[in-house]
Amino acid sequence: MIYNEYSNNIAKRIGHYTQLPDGWAVAPMQMLCSLIDGEKQNGIERINLDVKYLRGERDAKTLTSGKYVAANSLLILVNGENSGEVFRTPIDGYQGSTFKLLSINYDMNTEYVLQVINLHRTILRENKVGSAIPHLNKKLFKAIEVPIPPYKEQQRIVEAANKVFMSLDVIMGSL
């Protein structure tokens, strides 16, 4: 369960279903994915996949050692104001120091898990830990209770959510 600063069960307060459809389960996020580091490498020149580069705010800088991350990997920001933000790496490179590699279990739809993480971004952002530099509250992240439908239903949910987001983009563009 996820609790807010008043020790109220947030899931209960926002009305999450207590009865799930047949074939569904609930599991904490830590059962669905893990936050790890890339494999350490030395002597190979690669791009530093830091947050400014991944946002397109800075040109690539190269390093000759670091924690290797393959192209199309998922990096989650664990330090700073936007902790919980997830990036997909465009190329092979070295993991930026403010990131962890987000490793999602093979039996979960990656986009479904990313939708769940995105759903909880505000809670994660508002409940950071650390005084000098805010950090992702990993305990809170790992404890997020995730409703898990069968895989095909995960795909259907992602497709439906994407259609809604596309419609919202059209509406926002016309305002």
Predicted feature descriptions by range:
Residues 4, 8-39, 50-54, 147-175:
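Non-catalytic DNA-recognition/assembly elements of restriction-modification systems
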Residues 52-59, 65-118:
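A short beta-sheet element
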